[in-house]
Amino acid sequence: MKTHSDRKSGLHPRNRHQAPYDFDALCQRTPELQPFVFVNEHGTQTLDFADPAAVKALNKALLALHYGIAHWDLPAGYLCPPIPGRVDYLHRVADLLAESAGKVPTGKGVRVLDIGVGANCIYPLLGAREYGWRFVGSDIDPVSVKAATLLAKSNGLGSQIECRLQGKAGDIFQGIVAQRERFALTLCNPPFHASLAEASKGTERKLRNLGKEATAKPVLNFGGQKAELWCEGGEAAFLASMITQSKAFASQCLWFSSLVSKKENLPAAKQGLSRIGARQVRVLEMAQGNKISRVLAWSFQDEAASRQWWSPMAHDNA
């Protein structure tokens, strides 16, 4: 029997999700996925991607089968991320680190900060499993911090993933990064929308694309709390704030990075980076089928200093 969709074009070569989903293997590993799988009119196994319960069950199965993450769940109403795209971000920035390290750096000596870790803890879980990296995940929502901490511990990664509560709205690095703490990389999936109404419209658009009728009060089909989905000024404002605040931590992080969903937000972000004196700026394109997104990465170290970052002497005070 055929499985869902064609090959997912555009994914990173190391991405485990190049091929169509193997629903037989996924259901064998995670039987709770089985009720959501059906054969469509083309004779292809698939599921209803507009159904939050189906998407959540698929995520649990993918994480268990491909990454050995046996325990994964979410509090009701929290963001349920698409696994192939999230892990693609990690592979792209791993290659970026490899440019100065000489090879893709692995192991607990590579410290990564995930800004807005969310209740799903997805980047730390995937990064710890794929590359052995050590993570700090920050979030302004206490429920997310508690849930992410539980996920790390329940998968035997409690010593590798630490979640910290950001106590001050508006601060991104301050209050999270300690004075002498160093990170090879920061990650962020910033709030996309400028308001709840805009987030709801985005869900209606997704449902139309999936051939579904939008309800009078649309359910956010991938879930999401306020801090996960929207902020004042949307993605552009959050990105501008992150760029400005990163300057104060220029010597403590090799590469800062963020997903940028809206291409039109790039020019202003690049101008902001130029103003604060970023030495290196990169845009890493990502594609999954027809969906195009990108990672904006910047560093206050030049190429020579970036190579020096990985020398043992550079980590004496880490």
UniProtKB/Swiss-Prot annotation:
Its EC number is 2.1.1.181. The keyword Transferase applies. It catalyses: adenosine(1618) in 23S rRNA + S-adenosyl-L-methionine = N(6)-methyladenosine(1618) in 23S rRNA + S-adenosyl-L-homocysteine + H(+). It is found in: Cytoplasm. This is Ribosomal RNA large subunit methyltransferase F. CDD domains: AdoMet_MTases. Specifically methylates the adenine in position 1618 of 23S rRNA. Gene3D superfamilies: Vaccinia Virus protein VP39. Signal peptide: none annotated. It comes from Aeromonas hydrophila subsp. hydrophila (strain ATCC 7966 / DSM 30187 / BCRC 13018 / CCUG 14551 / JCM 1027 / KCTC 2358 / NCIMB 9240 / NCTC 8049). It comes from the Bacteria.
